[in-house]
Amino acid sequence: MGTDQYHEPPDELPAHVRTFARMCASLVEEAEAIGWYEQRLALEADPEAAAIMREAQVEEFNHFSMDLEFLLRRTPLWREIAERVLFQPGPIVERAEVAEEEVIHGDEGDGSLGIGGRKGDEP
């Protein structure tokens, strides 16, 4: 395994952080493979070859999903945000902004950034 996914010396990192880094790398690799199959399928004229490629892509979807679930289980904050963004109706960016506000400031967030008012303003 290479060390290019690390920004800190790997031998100084605890085991769970190295595992997390490996799983992030695996997630990226699965996403790349999904994209590669999508490109191949877009050009493949032979139906039998396309069916085989589609089956392989489905396996990559499964691998990606397992990697993501592992990471979400190990990172509660990420999971909490993801649960409020994934598979929700409405504009994605809007849902993400609301999710961040809810997770950071609680469900009763007032929409502010929590920085405070100008000097002399009433609280």
Task: Please place each PLM-identified region on the residue numbering.
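Iron-associated oxidoreductase/ferritin-like identity signal
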Residues: 1-123
